[in-house]
Design a protein with these regions (language model features):
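Short coil-to-beta-strand
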Residues: 1-8
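Feature marks hydrolase-like catalytic cores characterized by long aromatic- and Gly/Pro-rich stretches
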Residues: 10-153
């Protein structure tokens, strides 16, 4: 099963981002309420539903790490994601940026920066999530390497 939650509003704000504060409060409040609810709701095969569910929070694109001249942030090819729940190796950050704030190559098994690694993309995360859900990723994302660093062994 899959559920998707959207917080309405104009998120694509290149200036005056303070107008997004209520949206962030709504989003993180809803996320907090969801996690709390999962932690006290009986699961189907485990004691609590949080032990059966994976929650992913991300956007389809990133934002520049520095402010632009209009007090906002522009589109950026690097994005962050929060992944929590069953089967996920949590409590850490993966990847890195260089001094110019450009994403570095990553070892897909450890999640650490590596000169011999590859650039991490949303498709690599998608393959890992499909594997976590017991779905063969080759059917949907053939030839894409899995970002296994997020998977609990």
């Amino acid at each position: 099963r899959t559920a998707m939650i959207g917080i309405p509003g104009a998120w694509d704000c290149h200036g005056g981002v303070e107008v997004n504060a209520p949206q962030f409060e709504s989003f993180f409040g809803a996320l907090d309420a969801l996690m709390d609810h999962l932690a006290i709701t009986p699961g189907q095969s485990t004691r609590w539903l949080i032990d059966e569910v994976v929650v992913v929070a991300m956007s389809e694109f990133g934002r520049t790490p520095l402010w632009n001249g209009a007090g906002g942030k522009d589109h950026w090819p690097f994005v962050s994601a929060m992944v929590a729940g069953s089967g996920v190796r949590g409590g850490r950050s993966y990847g890195a940026t260089d001094d110019g704030l450009i994403g570095k190559k990553v070892d897909y098994r450890s999640g650490s920066p590596s000169d011999t690694g590859d650039m991490l993309g949303t498709e690599n995360l998608g393959v890992a999530l499909l594997k976590l859900g017991g779905v063969n990723p080759d059917r949907f994302l053939p030839g894409i390497q899995s970002f296994d660093a997020i998977l609990r062994e």
